[in-house]
Amino acid sequence: MLPIEVVAVPQGEGKIQITGSLGDVMKESAQLAITYARVHAPEYGLDPNSIKKMDLHIHAPEGAVPKDGPSAGVTLTTALMSCLTGWPVRCDVAMTGEITLHGNVLPIGGLKEKSMAAYREGMKTVLIPKGNESDLYEVDEEVKKAIQFVPVSDLEQVLKATLEPPAKTEKNKNAQSFISNPAAESPAAAVM
């Protein structure tokens, strides 16, 4: 399991910092997450121009351990959107999946191993790419009994399943309070 953390400074200069010994593919996934957030900002009560001006810092803890691969795309996006909206990430959900520029979720490798890691961490729900649904036969029966696997095909489904927004009347108020906050941070979202 790999937690992802995001901090945003609204009165910044548009700088983006990505840390935690991330390889090129994972850094590209972070860039995709940022583009997705900017494009879809209005759907979440956010101003895309405000996001452009923010300093963003994305971090994967345990910096001494090199990390790479596209599987963290959904998690990077979830952590970023949590930070920007102020909506917490459900703590009983893990996720995995590569993302595209248009918000599609693509299959990953190692579903069996990633599922076992989620099981060991006590996760109750795991979001997997729809394209990996046929790979569930590889997952141990004990793990399948303990975890609800939710196949997803796009980031909209991921964010609906992972973020806990306030009541609809609070949506824009919450986003505005974030914008006025000198620095906001996301709770960690977990990727397998």
List each language-model region with its residue ranges.
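Peripheral, non-AAA+ core regions of ATP-driven protein-machinery
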Residues: 1-192
